[in-house]
Amino acid sequence: MAEQDVENELLDYDEDEEPQVPQESTPAPPKKDVKGSYVSIHSSGFRDFLLKPELLRAIVDCGFEHPSEVQHECIPQAILGMDVLCQAKSGMGKTAVFVLATLQQIEPINGQVSVLVMCHTRELAFQISKEYERFSKYMPSVKVSVFFGGLSIKKDEDVLKKNCPHVVVGTPGRILALVRSRSLNLRNVKHFVLDECDKMLEQLDMRRDVQEIFRLTPHEKQCMMFSATLSKEIRPVCRKFMQDPMEVFVDDETKLTLHGLQQYYVKLKDSEKNRKLFDLLDVLEFNQVVIFVKSVQRCMALAQLLVEQNFPAIAIHRGMAQEERLSRYQQFKDFQRRILVATNLFGRGMDIERVNIVFNYDMPEDSDTYLHRVARAGRFGTKGLAVTFVSDENDAKILNDVQDRFEVNVAELPEEIDISTYIEQSR
């Protein structure tokens, strides 16, 4: 199918496609276009958003005190049901925006799915479902389920039949399969969310799935889309799903530098990478480390080498069964292992709060992937360190692209690094 046909498929519904039910709703606030710079701690607290007491209790339990700029800009409009298109750097708490906004508005009705959240990877879907569970801790009537490929669809169908969730998180392929098998009914969806939306809308096959799912939801609903990278080309595609959205672009896309993150490179031969990595792990102070490699084979081999050198390492890659991947992800998140070796599969949207060092053992294939990898360190405005190994001319070219695009200077790794520049000091 031609790109033009796909664009045309995104046009709005015909008015007679679905009976319109008049809804009592708060009039939408005027459209707001927000641009700004990131401030790690905003002066107002979450209480200013007038959230449900159950949500405020959960927020306190999670240790959040002040909303980030993205949360400050988006949440007041999002809880009124306004459509939101948001681009902001990794680690700024975008997930909490739609989780809190949808839980604030939800009125759980047995047997009805009210919230549908989709993202492009299984791991991210799993993580988002965990965020819903964290924030709905004091809302026992709200049921959350996550559905994605790689696990038995029969189990998913049983869950939908016997214990229908109010919040569904999943990947487009599995969601569409459940809809086609008539297990998942989307006729009562009031909130439609895409996280890392550019990844889903840039890939034509995934975009078609998203469009088909979108058409099966009611015309009147809230639509929210979020991403760390939102090119000027993809923004009009996003807008076709929305009605007069509030658009929040925190920082210009060419300046996606991460506050508090120190970025360095090391020039070396491919054969020298292991020795250099071991040396750095010996001398650097770290809470947790993520090491990115380019293939499953390298991932397995490097993790094995690290274990043999007595480093507490664990690997996650696409060659594993889904249950094993999620189990290992949870082990790392629970601090049972301090070093994770991963392929790009893990690079985007994963939120591990204790990670303060990221190694690009193999250079990422482009500047976007670089951003999503290094953003694993220094999330929520904390300090972190990113070290990239450069072993050939192509690596050097990509590093130059990163520096040009994001207007950052990635310097050569010095002999010694002041620990206070990349790790939070206890007071």
From Swiss-Prot:
One of its GO terms (cellular component) is nucleus. Residues 260-421 form the Helicase C-terminal domain. GO terms for molecular function: ATP binding; ATP hydrolysis activity; identical protein binding; mRNA binding; RNA binding; RNA helicase activity. The modification Phosphothreonine is found at T171. PROSITE patterns: HELICASE_ATP_BIND_1, HELICASE_CTER, Q_MOTIF. There is a cross-link at K31, K35, K154, K162, K240, K255 (Glycyl lysine isopeptide (Lys-Gly) (interchain with G-Cter in SUMO2)). It is found in: Nucleus; Cytoplasm. A motif (Q motif) lies at residues 44-72. The modification N6-acetyllysine is found at K35. A motif (DECD box) lies at residues 195-198. SUMOylated by RANBP2; SUMOylation modification affects its ability to bind RNA. ATP binds at A88, K89, S90, G91, M92, G93, K94, T95. The modification N-acetylalanine is found at A2. Residues 75-248 form the Helicase ATP-binding domain. Keywords: Acetylation, ATP-binding, Cytoplasm, Helicase, Hydrolase, Isopeptide bond, mRNA processing, mRNA splicing, Nucleotide-binding, Nucleus, Phosphoprotein, Ubl conjugation. Gene3D superfamilies: P-loop containing nucleotide triphosphate hydrolases. One of its GO terms (biological process) is mRNA splicing, via spliceosome. Residues 1-35 are annotated as: Disordered. The modification Phosphoserine is found at S37, S426. It catalyses: ATP + H2O = ADP + phosphate + H(+). Binds ALYREF/THOC4 and DDX39B/BAT1. Interacts with the apo-AREX complex component SARNP. Interacts with MX1. Interacts with MCM3AP isoform GANP. Interacts with ECD. Interacts with PHAX; this interaction stimulates PHAX RNA binding activity. Helicase that plays an essential role in mRNA export and is involved in multiple steps in RNA metabolism including alternative splicing. Regulates nuclear mRNA export to the cytoplasm through association with ECD. Also involved in spliceosomal uridine-rich small nuclear RNA (U snRNA) export by stimulating the RNA binding of adapter PHAX. Plays a role in the negative regulation of type I IFN production by increasing the nuclear retention of antiviral transcripts and thus reducing their protein expression. Belongs to the DEAD box helicase family. DECD subfamily. This is ATP-dependent RNA helicase DDX39A. The lineage of its organism: Eukaryota, Metazoa, Chordata, Craniata, Vertebrata.
